[in-house]
């Protein structure tokens, strides 16, 4: 039974919940459920897990009886189930609940519980999975007819506005919040193709996403990362609900891929698949060559070309000749009057001179002062330029970075103000989201980013801290669970002996090794050991928060990059600055737990579920494994973290080098031993980033890993990805790249949000100090010109949001028109 977006909760999961409620497990009795990890694994971002219904429908008899309140107290003496009621009776009942929502507090909660039971599909009155899915769709549609979702959201906004600072200490307020979050979950979980309904949810005021994020920040700050409270609080519901809101209002993974494909077709129209495409750098070189003869080509031309390897990184990398000049302007570079480059007077060989000339032509910024005289351009040159532009391989990120970099350059140098001030002012004050306004989904994503911008820094900081503390707690709980079972301890010891060349194999271990059974499904590396109900409940709740946060990070990175690349770079920078890389590496390593486990059970556990590969890959036939749903969550958590890590470090040499220095590659090698194709692929992609910065001895000793990277990862035909340039030059290039990109990110946000950036200064004090020091060092070494602090500093005083009007006033320019 595959997990789909339409089946928000599977029928089998409801049956397990009902079984749990009817016959609750003892506190110290092992909990065994038939997991659905294989079904859940089929859809990454839209998968649903065994504890999801336990998350939004508390597994206890009191809550269950409240869900059935309409049958006992308010059923108008009708002795029939919900499924057997007529459509008019259902509508009258929902209308009655709608009236009660606006009445006193005594009846409001009972009406909300009844609506929650209806929205959950009335699972105790249906007999099959198909009936359950149909019941959910029908009931939610009826609730929408009477605007029940909007009414519930208005109650949530009213409660959020009037809540006290210490509302978590009040069990009544916390229970009411859990009830409202559960209702919002069921209303947003059901997949709906009705554009009117989606538009109504997007147009709610205040918006849903920033409201939930602000509540998440308040709850996390109040709890102060007390994990004992997190387990029993509404924070786990809230974190998953934020992720679910992003899916429903932005789009799922499949919809994201369709949107990316559509944008690619728009940007590469009239291109031929039989002929090779040129790069953006080739087109810039062509424009420079033409501009030396025909100045009209220099009108809207970008002075800094893009690098061939990483097309959206600015400025170029690994070029010593580039470092000897500024990337914004330089008087010694070529011009239309004198297009020849400076010739080195030092005696060099013919081959080295030719190589130096080629490198200079490919990487030197072609900056020059355009000739204002209008010359006639031959038709053949214009036609060649159009064909070349159509054959140029471009991406949305390249176009956005080129545009933003041109604005920064023009405003920094104050060029063309006298010649054509009105045109320059319109370009600077143009539409903020010129690349995504044509698409309604990207426009809404941009609006969501605008709403989230004041809370983004604080939210990412608290979310990453919460991820760290929860992952550390989960590892400790797993070690405690290992230590609580003597039988499992013996099994681990036997399997640890299998990998040891010095110890003798037991009969059971030898027989298991001889069978050499291949693992095919996710259930085979489930954490199949007997644990108490208390530990199982804690692990399920904590892992659910880990899955929600990792999925949310991945979803935001993907959609923000599609809307604007600088939003993606800002989020990636926040994750990097809050040490997500180190936290993930520590979670895989977990030094203290590793030593304890190795001492007790002779098995080094690599974190998450990598220990399962050593535990169960030999004894699947002889000893039955108790499957648990958390194994699929662990699998998806790991893949999400690997994908987030790859996106954060993919375009930064400094971050790639940190991966190599942190010995993360040793933990990734352990993940390659787990027989799962997707997990191996994402682990290989992260390993590919760190390979150039690893030593030659490591490469020679791990040629099998490099071979797997060649076979599974998309690479160019050359082998340059395995090696990096000269160490000092690479570091200087990376430093220049990081500094310029940070300036560009800040310039973009200051241009759009103006005075709002002032409130973020307290979160960016250290960042601004480091950036200011880097700019001064690069300017002193003539690697770049000093950029005014008003263009990138959040602490710069601005009287109003009209930032550029103030800058024009400072230059004594009053009449823009």
Curated annotation (Swiss-Prot):
One of its GO terms (biological process) is cytoskeleton organization. SMART domains: DUF3402, N1221. The modification Phosphoserine is found at residue 500. It is found in: Vacuole. Keywords: Cell cycle, Phosphoprotein, Vacuole. GO terms for cellular component: cytosol; FAR/SIN/STRIPAK complex; fungal-type vacuole; mitotic spindle pole body; nuclear envelope; old mitotic spindle pole body. InterPro entries: Far11/STRP, Far11/STRP_C, Far11/STRP_N. It holds the Pfam family DUF3402. The modification Phosphothreonine is found at residue 502. It comes from the Eukaryota. Belongs to the FAR11 family. Participates in the control of the reentry into the cell cycle following pheromone treatment. This is Factor arrest protein 11. The lineage of its organism: Eukaryota, Fungi, Dikarya, Ascomycota, Taphrinomycotina. The gene is far11.
């Amino acid at each position: 039974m595959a997990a789909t977006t339409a089946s928000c909760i599977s029928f089998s999961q409801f049956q397990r919940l009902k079984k749990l409620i009817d016959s609750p497990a003892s506190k110290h009795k092992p909990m065994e459920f038939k997991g659905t990890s294989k079904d859940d694994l089929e859809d990454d971002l839209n998968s649903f897990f065994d504890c999801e219904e336990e998350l939004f429908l508390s597994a206890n008899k009191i809550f269950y009886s409240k869900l059935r309140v309409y049958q006992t107290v308010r059923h108008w003496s009708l002795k029939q189930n919900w499924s057997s009621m007529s459509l008019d009776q259902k509508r009258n009942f929902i209308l009655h609940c709608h009236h009660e929502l606006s009445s006193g507090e005594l009846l409001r909660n009972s009406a909300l519980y009844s609506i929650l039971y209806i929205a959950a599909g009335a699972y105790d009155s249906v007999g099959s999975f198909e009936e359950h899915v149909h019941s959910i769709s029908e009931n939610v549609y009826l609730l929408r007819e009477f605007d029940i979702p909007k009414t519930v959201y208005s109650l949530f906004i009213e409660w959020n506005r009037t809540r006290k600072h210490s509302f978590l200490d009040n069990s009544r307020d916390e229970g009411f919040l859990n009830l409202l979050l559960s209702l919002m979950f069921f209303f947003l979980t059901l997949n709906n193709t009705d554009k009117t309904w989606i538009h109504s949810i997007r147009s709610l005021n205040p918006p849903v996403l920033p409201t939930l994020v602000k509540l998440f920040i308040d709850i996390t700050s109040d709890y102060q990362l007390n994990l004992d409270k997190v387990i029993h609080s509404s924070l786990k519901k809230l974190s998953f609900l934020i992720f679910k809101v992003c899916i429903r209002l932005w789009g799922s993974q499949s919809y994201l891929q369709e949107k990316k494909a559509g944008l690619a077709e728009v940007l590469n129209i009239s291109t031929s698949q039989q002929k090779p495409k040129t790069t953006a750098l080739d087109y810039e070189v062509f424009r420079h060559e033409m501009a030396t003869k025909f100045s009209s080509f220099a009108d809207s031309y970008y002075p800094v070309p893009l690098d061939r390897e990483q097309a959206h990184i600015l400025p170029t990398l690994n070029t010593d000749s580039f470092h000897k000049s500024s990337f914004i302007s330089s008087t010694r570079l070529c011009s239309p009057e004198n297009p020849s480059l400076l010739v080195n007077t030092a005696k060099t060989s013919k081959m080295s001179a030719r190589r130096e000339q080629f490198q200079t032509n490919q990487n030197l910024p072609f900056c020059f002062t355009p000739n204002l005289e209008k010359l006639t351009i031959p038709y053949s040159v214009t036609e060649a330029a159009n064909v070349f532009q159509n054959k140029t391989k471009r991406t949305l990120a390249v176009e956005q970075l080129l545009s933003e970099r041109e604005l920064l350059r023009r405003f920094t140098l104050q060029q063309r103000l006298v010649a054509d001030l009105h045109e320059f002012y319109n370009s600077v004050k143009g539409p903020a989201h010129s690349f995504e306004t044509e698409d309604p989904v990207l426009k809404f994503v941009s609006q969501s980013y605008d709403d989230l911008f004041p809370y983004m820094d604080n939210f990412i900081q608290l979310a990453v801290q919460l991820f760290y503390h929860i992952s550390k707690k989960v590892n400790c709980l797993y070690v405690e669970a290992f230590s609580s079972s003597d039988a499992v301890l013996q099994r681990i010891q036997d399997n640890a002996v299998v990998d040891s060349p010095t110890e003798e194999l037991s009969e059971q271990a030898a027989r298991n090794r001889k069978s050499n059974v291949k693992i095919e499904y996710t259930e085979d590396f489930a954490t199949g050991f007997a644990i108490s109900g208390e530990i199982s409940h804690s692990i399920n709740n904590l892992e659910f928060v880990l899955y929600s946060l990792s999925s949310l990070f991945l979803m935001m990175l993907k959609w923000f990059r599609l809307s604007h690349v600088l939003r993606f770079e800002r989020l990636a920078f926040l994750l990097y600055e809050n040490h997500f890389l180190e936290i993930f590496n520590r979670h895989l390593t977990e030094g203290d737990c590793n030593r304890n486990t190795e001492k007790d059970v002779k098995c080094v556990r690599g974190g998450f579920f990598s220990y399962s590969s050593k535990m169960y890959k030999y004894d699947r036939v002889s000893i039955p494994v108790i499957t648990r749903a958390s194994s699929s969550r662990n699998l998806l958590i790991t893949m999400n973290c690997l994908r987030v890590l790859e996106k954060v470090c993919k375009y930064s040499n400094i971050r790639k080098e940190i991966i190599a220095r942190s010995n993360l590659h040793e933990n990734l090698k352990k993940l390659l031993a787990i027989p799962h194709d997707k997990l191996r692929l994402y682990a290989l992609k992260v390993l590919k980033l760190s390979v150039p910065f690893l030593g030659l001895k490591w490469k020679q000793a791990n040629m099998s890993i490099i071979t797997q990277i060649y076979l599974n990862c998309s690479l160019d035909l050359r082998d340059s990805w395995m090696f990096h340039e000269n160490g000092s030059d690479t570091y200087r290039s990376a430093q220049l790249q990081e500094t310029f990109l940070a300036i560009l990110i800040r310039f973009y946000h200051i241009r759009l949000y103006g005075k709002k950036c002032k409130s973020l200064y307290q979160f960016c004090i250290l960042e601004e100090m480091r950036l200011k020091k880097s700019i001064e060092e690069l300017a002193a070494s003539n690697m770049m010109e000093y950029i005014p602090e008003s263009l990138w500093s959040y602490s710069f005083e601005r009287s109003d949001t009209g930032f550029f009007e103030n800058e024009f006033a400072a230059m004594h320019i009053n009449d823009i028109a």
